[in-house]
Amino acid sequence: GNVWVTDFAVNEARTKGHQVHKFSSSGELLMSLGTAGQAGSEPNQFNQPNDVVTGPDGSIYVADGHNGQGMTTGQAIAAGIEAGSTGRIMKFSADGTFIKDWGQIGTLHGEFRTPHALAFDSEGRLFVADRGNHRIEIFDQDGNYLDSRYSYGRISGIFITEDNMLYAIDSESSGTSHPAWSNGVRIGPLNEDRITGFIPPFDSDSRPYQGAAGEGIAVDADGNVYAAEGPNSLSW
């Protein structure tokens, strides 16, 4: 199948970054969304896109805006919005035509402080890991708010299995960013807000940051869990 990636950061020449790319399985570039090297909040721009997923009908959904998680007061949020920072979900047709967006930096339902990961379930609901607000927000495909989950920590990546289990990797919980919580992988039934399993990070003498910065997660058909880690380590 095709591979989608978010090109989050801008290069020094400002000729790359703030884009979403679609590649074939052989690496051929098929589509690019966003304006290369230019951050913004217009329909043809991204400002640090975090994740991309395709919906049941082929529509494209992008979680846009990374720095909202650092805005912890109403004053900071207002200043961030005024400066052009984003916290939104953007929807495009399968051919890349902009359809709509929803959300801004904030704490209400339908607002985000760093929407960091996306996943669809078998019912076509969109799950958004709202990392800065320590929750998962659930929407229909038109952006209407449905529900929330609060048991998964400060979430960087999510994965939903065919048997309706939710896996969420928490890379940032600590005594300063999310007191009384620890990082690791939390597992729970999709339609309930409770945890039934936990995979803690593991120690390594040679790699002191191991297990401390998990950004993405996947589960294969045999139940094996894969986690991508960065920037200070390479893999779980």
Predicted regions: what is each one?
Residues G1-W236:
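Eukaryotic scaffold repeat domains enriched in small/polar residues
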